[in-house]
């Protein structure tokens, strides 16, 4: 009797498996249930919400850095998206970056980006921005410093090897000189290029024009020639992204020699 019961169970198992293969049987209880959710429209914003806990931790760490390096740290702030920014004196580039890289509570060992911002209305028009990443604590920090056209900034290659090409790009595009750089030369523009294209006062047309001369069978460089006479364009726009960096427009003044040009 026991052997017959086992045989019947074995035969029912085969029939059940074949029925499932044909799609005519019921699913087995061992199958995991599929979770289905409604595909309703999500109207929530896609921005990252504010995290008060992370905001407090970043603020505390920023204050800690300011206490350790009071000679160099000038300002510490946390943005609304939990991004820590440390503004330092130009002389503190190497000490601050070394501290953030080697300290046990920091471990910012990756330089993910190094760039510059040109604000001509400031006395120190160039803002140098270092973006660091800590894989140990899954955290980021932004270090900012400043300089002008003539004052050099200490190169960060001795702290982060990745700063080599970043600093070459800043020198090429903005003209910021990095002292003690192992190979500070242009990296994007051609040899003999004049000026620095990312400066706000760099003309859109450039200073020279490169074209192929069919007579000499090579590329020649010539000064830019405008096809029309110079006009003064209105640089103030209602869609200006950074209006606070613009100087207020000067009111037009009527000189004595221009009175005859006014319509009667």
Swiss-Prot record:
Family membership: Belongs to the complex I 30 kDa subunit family.
Subcellular localization: Mitochondrion inner membrane
Function per UniProt: Core subunit of the mitochondrial membrane respiratory chain NADH dehydrogenase (Complex I) which catalyzes electron transfer from NADH through the respiratory chain, using ubiquinone as an electron acceptor. Essential for the catalytic activity and assembly of complex I.
Residues annotated as transit peptide in the record: 1-36
EC category: translocase
Topology versus the membrane: Peripheral membrane protein
Subunit comment: Core subunit of respiratory chain NADH dehydrogenase (Complex I) which is composed of 45 different subunits. Interacts with NDUFAF3. Interacts with RAB5IF. Found in subcomplexes containing subunits NDUFS2, MT-ND1 and NDUFA13.
Lineage top rank: taxon: Eukaryota
InterPro entries from the UniProt entry: NADH_DH_suC, NADH_quin_OxRdtase_su_C/D-like, NADH_UbQ_OxRdtase_30kDa_su, NADH_UbQ_OxRdtase_CS
Entries under SUPFAM superfamilies matching the protein: Nqo5-like
BP-aspect Gene Ontology terms: mitochondrial electron transport, NADH to ubiquinone; mitochondrial respiratory chain complex I assembly; reactive oxygen species metabolic process
Classification via Pfam families: Complex1_30kDa
HAMAP family: NDH1_NuoC
Identification of the protein by name: NADH dehydrogenase [ubiquinone] iron-sulfur protein 3, mitochondrial
Keywords: Electron transport, Membrane, Mitochondrion, Mitochondrion inner membrane, NAD, Oxidoreductase, Respiratory chain, Transit peptide, Translocase, Transport, Ubiquinone
């Amino acid at each position: 009797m026991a052997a017959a019961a086992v045989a019947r169970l074995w035969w029912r198992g085969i029939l059940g498996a074949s029925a499932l293969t044909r799609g005519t049987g019921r699913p087995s209880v061992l199958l995991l249930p599929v979770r289905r959710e409604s595909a309703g429209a999500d109207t929530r914003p896609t921005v990252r919400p504010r995290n008060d806990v992370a905001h407090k931790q970043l603020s505390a760490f920023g204050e800690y850095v300011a206490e350790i390096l009071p000679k160099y740290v000038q300002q510490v702030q946390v943005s609304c998206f939990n991004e820590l920014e440390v503004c330092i004196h130009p002389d503190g580039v190497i000490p601050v970056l070394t501290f953030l890289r080697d300290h046990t509570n920091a471990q910012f060992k990756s330089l993910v980006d190094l760039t510059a911002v040109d604000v001509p209305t400031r006395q120190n028009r160039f803002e140098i921005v270092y973006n660091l990443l800590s894989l140990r604590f899954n955290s980021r920090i932004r270090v900012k410093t400043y300089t002008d056209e003539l004052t050099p900034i200490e190169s960060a290659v001795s702290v982060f090897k990745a700063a080599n090409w970043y600093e070459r790009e800043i020198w090429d595009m903005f003209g910021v000189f990095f002292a003690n750089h192992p190979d500070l030369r242009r990296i994007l523009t051609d040899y003999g290029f004049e000026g620095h294209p990312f400066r706000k006062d760099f003309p859109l047309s450039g200073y020279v024009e490169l074209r192929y001369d069919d007579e000499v069978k090579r590329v020649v460089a010539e000064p830019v020639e405008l096809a029309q006479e110079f006009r003064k364009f209105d640089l103030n726009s209602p869609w200006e992204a950074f209006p606070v960096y613009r100087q207020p427009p000067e009111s037009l003044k009527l000189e004595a020699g221009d009175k005859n040009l006014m319509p009667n």
